[in-house]
């Protein structure tokens, strides 16, 4: 056994980048296999599947209607990874995200090692301890390609005697790539981060060369988008694109959201990053950490312009948070006047925490299983994920036995946390939000009849139902809404008057808070509401009811 371990470690030392990339990709694939898409990823899965039945255009579609919030490039990649729509599941739809995520983490290691031997290893370890980062990678991480472009650009800029003309061409190509993936936001974020890196590096010739290239590329991309959208859909498509991609991104909000509010989201990765900022001193203005901070803060400051507030937009900055935190661990020191007794206590406590983390994560897999029994039917629990996570953590503990250095202990702890996220926490969330049991119950009760939703947003709730049924069945799902509800063109919305004309004794799905309103509307039509059962769509519970005629009293 020891010979095998030595052979594997020898190969890993010789081909570290490939080892990190393929190891992470394998773990991500195993962790996502068999899981259901949840939250916003359900919408992305639905859009990917919709490409099979509708022409592929500049935007993904829902029932053939363009959804202007995203270009279709990432969805085309996902559609190809589903074998052109033949296997539409979480692990196939999110395969491009997992590839870009594994690549970004491997490139984070390479950037750190290029700057200083050993720093890349610490940056790699810190990349494994952010649940939000992993959650994005194992979901439909539409911002991960932009993240991959960012680390690629910085890795290229680290090369000695780099030709400015060549690097400018690569930068321009990456801007086009980001525009194709993320629309105008993609190249703007990449350009801001790269500008921050160059400014803190003092490379002003490259800075102005990139700035000129960026302005030309962005203008060209917007001009091409204007021509393409007018050619495909006329003024209407361009106006919708402009509204969704520009106006909706500037809808107001706290300017401190990304600078302050998002830091807890990426904990515990953000802890060493904050330590670096506090203890780094004047060294923060110098290479290598200065340019990394320049990249990160340029992105965060740009995002802090009041607008849409989603932490996933910060994905591009995460590798540089890990790199800065790794530098702080190795070099930043707080000048605390502590006695030797207190220093010894702190060291002992830190060592104890690192020793306990692997065993805590093994216990955590068992705890996730036990807790899941209270929220999920036993037949829907991801037993295989919990078992595999437990075994992988045990294997990691075995492989690191006898290694007592701080680096080895931190490496073991970070590996165990990453495995715990992938094989315990994320599967537990997926199982807890799995909509299949409720959908199957509704389908069994309704047979071939239509299904109605009452006062529920189709884009957030109804799509969780639609994603679980086939294309033919989706055409039999309708959404009844009163005047207080916003309607969208993508779904089969009906007003109360229209919906009640269609409605017989079919199943109606609603939240309990709307039961009284539905009862009043039904009473006006001499019908009564009969509850059938309840269940979950996502993380909320919903009622399934029928409307049946009121019993007419017999004449005396």
Question: In which residue ranges do the predicted regions lie?
Answer:
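Loop-to-helix entry region of an early transmembrane alpha helix in multi-pass inner-membrane enzymes
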Residues: 68, 72-76, 84-103, 136, ...
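Short acidic/glycine- and proline-prone juxtamembrane loop motifs at membrane-interface regions
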Residues: 94, 132-146, 183
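Specific aromatic-rich, kink-prone transmembrane helix
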Residues: 107, 126-127, 145-162, 173-175, ...
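Membrane-interface transmembrane helices that cradle and orient dolichyl/undecaprenyl
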Residues: 113-118, 151-170, 178, 281, ...
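Short periplasmic/luminal acceptor-recognition loop of GT-C membrane glycosyltransferases, typified by
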Residues: 406-549
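Extracytosolic helix-loop segments that constitute the early lumenal/periplasmic catalytic or substrate-binding loops
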Residues: 26-28, 43-66, 73-76
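Transmembrane-lumen/periplasm boundary regions of multi-pass, lipid-linked membrane glycan transferases
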Residues: 44-50, 177, 186-291, 295-312, ...
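Transmembrane-helix signature of polytopic, membrane-embedded enzymes
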Residues: 13, 17-22, 108-129, 147
């Amino acid at each position: 056994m020891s010979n095998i371990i030595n052979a594997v470690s020898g190969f890993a030392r010789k081909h570290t980048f490939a080892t990190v990339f393929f190891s992470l990709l394998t773990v991500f694939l195993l962790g996502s296999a068999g899981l259901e898409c949840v939250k916003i990823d359900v919408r992305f899965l639905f859009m990917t599947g919709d490409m099979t039945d509708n022409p592929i255009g500049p935007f993904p579609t829902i029932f053939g209607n363009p959804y202007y919030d995203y270009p279709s490039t990432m969805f085309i990649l996902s559609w190809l990874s589903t074998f052109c729509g033949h296997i539409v599941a979480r692990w196939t739809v999110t395969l491009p995200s997992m590839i870009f995520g594994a690549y970004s983490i491997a490139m984070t290691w390479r950037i750190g090692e290029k700057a200083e031997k050993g720093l890349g290893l610490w940056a790699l370890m810190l990349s494994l301890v952010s649940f939000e980062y992993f959650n994005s990678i194992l979901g439909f991480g539409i911002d991960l390609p932009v993240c991959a472009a960012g680390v690629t650009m910085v890795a290229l800029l680290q090369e000695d005697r780099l030709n400015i003309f060549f690097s400018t061409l690569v930068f321009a190509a990456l801007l086009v790539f980001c525009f194709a993936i993320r629309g105008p936001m993609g190249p703007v974020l990449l350009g801001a981060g790269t500008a921050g890196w160059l400014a803190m590096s003092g490379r002003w010739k490259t800075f102005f060369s990139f700035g000129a290239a960026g302005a030309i590329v962005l203008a060209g991309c917007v001009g091409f988008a204007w021509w393409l959208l007018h050619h495909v859909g006329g003024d209407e498509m361009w106006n919708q694109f402009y509204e969704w991609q520009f106006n909706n991104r500037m809808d107001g909000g706290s300017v401190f959201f990304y600078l302050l509010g998002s830091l807890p989201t990426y904990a515990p990765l953000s802890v060493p990053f904050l330590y670096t900022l506090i203890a780094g001193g004047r060294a923060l203005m110098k290479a290598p950490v200065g340019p990394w901070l320049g990249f990160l803060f340029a992105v965060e400051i740009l995002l802090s312009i009041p607008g849409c507030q989603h932490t996933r937009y910060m994905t591009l900055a995460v590798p540089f948070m890990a790199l800065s935190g790794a530098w702080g661990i190795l070099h930043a020191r707080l000048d605390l006047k502590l006695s030797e007794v207190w220093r010894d206590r702190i060291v002992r406590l830190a060592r104890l925490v690192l020793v306990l983390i692997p065993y805590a994560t093994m216990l955590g897999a068992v705890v996730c299983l036990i807790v899941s029994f209270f929220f999920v039917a036993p037949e829907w629990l991801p037993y295989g994920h919990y078992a595999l996570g437990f075994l992988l953590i045990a294997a990691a503990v075995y492989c690191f036995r006898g290694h007592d250095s701080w680096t080895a202990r931190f490496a073991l702890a970070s590996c165990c946390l990453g495995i715990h996220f992938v094989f315990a926490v994320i599967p537990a969330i997926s199982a807890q939000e799995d909509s299949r049991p409720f959908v199957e119950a509704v389908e069994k009760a309704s047979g071939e009849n239509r299904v109605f939703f009452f006062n529920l947003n189709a884009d957030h709730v109804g799509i969780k139902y639609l994603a679980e049924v086939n294309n033919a069945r989706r055409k039999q799902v309708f959404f009844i809404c009163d005047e207080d509800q916003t309607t969208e063109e993508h779904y089969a919305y009906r007003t109360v008057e229209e919906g009640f004309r269609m409605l017989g004794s079919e199943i109606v799905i609603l939240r309990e808070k709307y039961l009284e309103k539905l009862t009043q509307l039904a009473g006006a039509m001499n019908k009564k509401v009969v509850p059938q059962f309840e269940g979950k769509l996502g993380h909320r519970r919903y009622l399934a009811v029928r409307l049946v005629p009121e019993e007419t009293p017999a004449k005396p």
